Amino acid sequence: MKRKRSLVLDDEDERAVELFADLGMPKNLAKTLIYISQCEECRSADVEQGADLRQPEVSVAMQELRKRGWAKKRDLKKKGKGRPVHVYQLTKPLPEILETFESEKLNEVKNIKNNLDQLQGLISDYRK
């Protein structure tokens, strides 16, 4: 990851994002995951800048990461009035998240293979 004012995704990070996307993960989710995996904690605004995403895209991605149990959020109170700042961090290391993702994808492949086998059996009756 390159450092400007905040961290930004580099070519290697972008390649990881593309691979996750090729495997069916939404690109914004992949960008967010890769970005926060390289930070101890990061604010929503950091993810927006570093991963080149808009606030709603980060919000949706973070909801999914939290739903999967891969990330957690805490609110950082600012002095004075105003909304708190959301700070995020992963709850599991990226290699463990990849293992879970791989398992999900292998299950999908298994189900596809099973459906194709069943379809093959049904279609073989039509040829007669």
For the regions a language model picked out, list residue spans one by one:
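Short, cationic-aromatic polyanion-contact patches
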Residues: 18-28, 43, 76-98
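Amphipathic alpha-helical dimerization/coiled-coil segments
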Residues: 92-128
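Canonical helix-turn-helix DNA-binding module
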Residues: 45-85
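N-terminal helix-turn-helix DNA-binding core of bacterial DNA-binding proteins
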Residues: 19-53
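N-terminal start-of-chain detector that recognizes signal peptides
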Residues: 4-8, 20, 43-44, 58-63, ...
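N-terminal leader segment of winged-helix/HTH proteins
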Residues: 1-23, 79
